Amino acid sequence: MEKLIEPILVDELELELELEINSTPLKYKEITKDIKNILLIDDSVAQSDILFNSVNSNTLGIEYSNHSDRDELITLLTDNFQTIDRIGFVFNDGMINSKQFMNSELFFTKEDLEDGMTEYSPNVKFVLDIIKNFKITNIDYLVCNGLKESNWVRYFNLLNKETGVIVGASDNETGNLRYGGDWIMETTNEDVVNIYWNSNISNYTTITCDNKYHK
């Protein structure tokens, strides 16, 4: 009788291929003594190059992707700043409730928003630590219609509750008025365009909404 050859069992874990995602380096310009604001710009937002190149002399524009590394950003900030007045985030509203920030991880998880949480996911902890460590007074989310998303409102409230930071966010389209948006943070009724940008921002011909995306 022909002898059956038994299959060799291999631990499935040994067969798993680990996916290496190459970190996308942060893009930024010379850091001067006049800088007191940070503007983080997602490189997938429409016309991100104009947003990046139009920052004013008080603002350090940093272009990132969701594959960028938190450690690189915290090292950059720690090596160059003791305090930061305010920080802004510019990204589009595509897949807004599963929006990734750095290290290919979400801005926040559903668990972060549960009552009584004291331990948070990596990017929530990261933002909270930056606010506390650099004594940031204002944080602005320059994305379309953030205030219309209940989970984002809860996230904004979490940041305020944990740190006392003033959160700027919008309930309409964000961008230049002539193209259907504005730069007003409805939570504070503050127009932030001149806080972060110089007059070259007038060349931004779209809004930070995914359905208007074009480069």
Predicted region positions:
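Small-residue-enriched, tightly packed secondary-structure blocks
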Residues: 38-41, 45, 51, 60-70, ...
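Solvent-exposed loop and beta-edge segments used for protein-protein assembly and interaction
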Residues: 31-33, 81-83, 133-135
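A domain-level signal for caspase-like cysteine endopeptidase catalytic cores
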Residues: 13, 17, 21-76, 155
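Short, solvent-exposed mixed-charge patches
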Residues: 1-2, 213-215
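Caspase-like cysteine protease fold
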Residues: 169-213
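Short, intrinsically disordered N-terminal pre-domain segments
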Residues: 1-10
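Catalytic cores of nucleophile-dependent amide-cleaving enzymes
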Residues: 85-86, 92-178
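Short, flexible loop/turn elements at secondary-structure junctions
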Residues: 43, 143-145, 189
